Design a protein with these regions (language model features):
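Hydrophobic aliphatic residue packing
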Residues: 7, 29-31, 73
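A short, structured beta-strand/loop element
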Residues: 20-63
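Negatively charged, low-complexity tracts enriched in Asp/Glu with abundant Ser/Thr
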Residues: 1-16
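Residue-level detector of solvent-exposed, low-hydrophobicity positions
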Residues: 15, 20, 28, 91-94
Length: 94
């Protein structure tokens, strides 16, 4: 995996966005539990229009942590969208 920028740390989670040139649509974030199983991660698609956050892939993360990660990303959606645009440009619809 390429370099990743940490754009949010809260509630024991680290939220990151892959840095260019490693970009692949759709817009998404990688969320890891800071103090739990090493390597556990969930990839969440950022909201598009009326659709909310969508779980794309889960790697070894407990269901309760996945739910908490979704809530965290939903609560910080505007911040994460700005971060995506900062690193990848455009309207963040990619």
């Amino acid at each position: 995996m390429g370099a990743m920028a940490t754009v949010l740390q809260a509630d024991g989670f680290r939220v990151g966005i892959l840095l260019p040139p490693r970009v692949h649509p759709p817009r998404h974030v990688h969320v890891a539990r800071s103090c739990r199983t090493r390597g556990a991660e969930v990839v969440l698609l950022l909201p598009q229009g009326p659709a909310g956050v969508v779980v794309r892939t889960v790697f070894g993360m407990r269901d309760a942590d996945v739910i908490a990660a979704v809530w965290l990303v939903e609560a910080n959606g505007a911040l994460l969208m700005r971060a995506w645009r900062t690193y990848h440009g455009g309207t963040a619809t990619e």
